[in-house]
Amino acid sequence: MYSAEAPSLKDAVVRFGGGCTGEMISPDGLVLTNHHCGYSSIQRHSTLEHDYLTDGFWAMSRDKELPNPGLTVTFIDKIDDVTDYVRTELKKITDPNSMEFLSAKYLNGLAKAKVGEKFLQDNPGTEVEIKAFYGGNKYYMFTKKIYSDVRLVGAPPSSIGKFGADTDNWMWPRHTGDFSLFRVYADANGNPAPYSETNVPLRPKRWLKLSIKGVEENDYAMIMGFPGRTNKYYTSWEVAERRDIDNAVRINIRNLRQEAMLEEMLKDPQVRIQYASKYAGSTNAYKNAIGSNWAINKRNFEQMKNDEQDRLIAWSKKMCEPAYPEALLTLEQIVNDRKDLRFRSWMLDEALSRGIEFSKVPTDIGTVCE
């Protein structure tokens, strides 16, 4: 399943784009991913004359495959536990209020320092990053190889790939043909390279073999991929915060924005194509927030968390461990104290940063300048 020295299953499971999962399914660099993961790329290639979103797209030969500037496929070469290294470096920080222990910029600086500039220069396309797990209790360094020449091979029409649309999204069972196909290209040595007609299909270390036999009850099954993050360790106060602030703001603001988008999309086929990916991305998180709040209330999840906390307090008293209830009190106070700030932050993000597209221009300029 995992080996840093030899080809393993993890070499066939890739990060597609900014956060999706893909699977290498051929020795010629073919990548299988979701239709919704390839949706923005399909949209960028769509026009009124060639509406690939509506009609689908299939490259009949490799020279017909479509390049996608900005799209990447990332392979994980290895994962190292660097907890001791990070903790040693953190001890050098004298500011007691420092948040560096969770800072991506700081942690990635440590990653580059650990491997050295020569390693990165000798391995083109390789990047390293350190991620904090469990709120900074564990740290892992990921050594990644990132390919930027990724071409669209095929996608079904949205009537298949997006069947059920927003009505069926986040609902199960699903009946969607949610897939698209891309191909990763590399230089002649198999290294990452910018798009070039001279690039060749990447031969991955490992690719998945597809079975048409199907499965039966009690067959072994597993999932590998890049799911993002979990908030399963939220306290009851954080659960309420997610429901009453985070999700509430997202639902209210996105509902207004999506109504405006849809009105214009229905008027003009060109606008429909141009806004298809933005609308889909917005409605995806919108419906997730609605479903999350429904589940929190339906399952009485806040009370379930309260019960867990009460059991922890009872255990800590029995074991003479006062640090645990003290930590809970601290967390409760922090969540209560930040309510107004958190509401303002979510309103700023949803209503201004995401809601008014022109507001992104100064942000993008600032990013480029940095």
What kind of region is each of these model predictions?
Residues 1-370:
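Terminal presequence/propeptide segments associated with secretion/organelle targeting
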